Amino acid sequence: MRHYEIVFIVHPDQSEQVPAMIERYKQLVTSQNGQIHRVEDWGRRQMAYMIQKLAKAHYVCLNIECGKDTLAELEHAFKFNDAVLRHLIVQTKKAETAPSPMMKEVQREEARKAAQTTTEGQPA
């Protein structure tokens, strides 16, 4: 089995359905003896260019290990899901388990926002 990194972009109106979509794709991989090495929900982000007159979308990254039949089934699921605006599948040499640079940025932003809310709540 080979290792793949998959990034897909979901319509912003469908953001609340993203956890269910991730679970469905994870189940599809594991049901066919595949492995999930990393799942990252990058959240709603600004896109580099407009897609279907949208400036923002919900980003998700998966690192999986599966066979080509499973990969074809995943790709088919992406193509026929109207909520998925774009998807990219890249073959990698090994399993990636460490947080991606994008996820580290998301974590930094969340930490900064948390620090701001705690300093705003304290009296001067």
From Swiss-Prot:
Pfam families assigned: Ribosomal_S6
Entry superkingdom: Bacteria
Annotated region described as Disordered, given as residue ranges: 96-124
Entry function: Binds together with bS18 to 16S ribosomal RNA.
GO cellular component: cytosolic small ribosomal subunit
Mitochondrion is among the record's keywords: no
An example molecular function term from Gene Ontology annotations: structural constituent of ribosome
CDD domains in the cross-refs: bS6
Entry protein name: Small ribosomal subunit protein bS6
Compositional bias (Polar residues): 115-124
